């Protein structure tokens, strides 16, 4: 059985972590425990008082036990966003 994540290899994905972070990058690999390898990644930090801050992370590993959601990003739509004008409350941590 192949993992649904194989369809995302070498594509731009957004990862929401269980501590409420949003990390965007190119999925380069993963393992059976959903540890993720992202390249050219950055974190999007949301704030209700100012625009989205992008923190460059580069090559980055996300531990599988910290992954809440993974989704593919439409690069055309994403590049059209004016992140400097988007204001939003940061996500809360996942409650177990």
UniProtKB/Swiss-Prot annotation:
Superkingdom of origin: Eukaryota
Keyword RNA-binding attributed: yes
Pfam families, alphabetized: LSM
Main location: nucleus
InterPro entries, A to Z: Lsm8, LSM_dom_sf, PTHR15588, Sm, Sm_dom_euk/arc
CDD domains: LSm8 (cd01727)
Residues the record lists as N-acetylthreonine modifications: 2
GO annotation terms (biological process): mRNA splicing, via spliceosome
Coiled coil regions, renumbered to chain: none
One GO location term (cellular component): U4/U6 x U5 tri-snRNP complex
GO molecular function, one term: mRNA binding
Residue ranges of domain Sm in the record: 1-76
Localization terms from the record: Nucleus
Keywords assigned by UniProt, alphabetized: Acetylation, mRNA processing, mRNA splicing, Nucleus, Ribonucleoprotein, RNA-binding, Spliceosome
Signal peptide: none
Function of the protein: Plays a role in pre-mRNA splicing as component of the U4/U6-U5 tri-snRNP complex that is involved in spliceosome assembly, and as component of the precatalytic spliceosome (spliceosome B complex). The heptameric LSM2-8 complex binds specifically to the 3'-terminal U-tract of U6 snRNA.
The family this protein is said to belong to: Belongs to the snRNP Sm proteins family.
Quaternary state and interactors: Component of the precatalytic spliceosome (spliceosome B complex). Component of the U4/U6-U5 tri-snRNP complex, a building block of the precatalytic spliceosome (spliceosome B complex). The U4/U6-U5 tri-snRNP complex is composed of the U4, U6 and U5 snRNAs and at least PRPF3, PRPF4, PRPF6, PRPF8, PRPF31, SNRNP200, TXNL4A, SNRNP40, SNRPB, SNRPD1, SNRPD2, SNRPD3, SNRPE, SNRPF, SNRPG, DDX23, CD2BP2, PPIH, SNU13, EFTUD2, SART1 and USP39, plus LSM2, LSM3, LSM4, LSM5, LSM6, LSM7 and LSM8.
Protein name as annotated: U6 snRNA-associated Sm-like protein LSm8
Organism whose genome encodes this protein: Homo sapiens
Species classification: Eukaryota, Metazoa, Chordata, Craniata, Vertebrata
């Amino acid at each position: 059985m192949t993992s649904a994540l194989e369809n995302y290899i070498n594509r731009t994905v957004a990862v929401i972590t269980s501590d409420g972070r949003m990390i965007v990058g190119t999925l380069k690999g993963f393992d059976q425990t959903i540890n993720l390898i992202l390249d050219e990644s950055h974190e999007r930090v949301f704030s209700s008082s100012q625009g989205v801050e992008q923190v460059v992370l580069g090559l980055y590993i996300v531990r599988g036990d910290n992954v809440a959601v993974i989704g593919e990003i439409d690069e055309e739509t994403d590049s059209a966003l004016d992140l400097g004008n988007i204001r939003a409350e940061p996500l809360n941590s996942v409650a177990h």
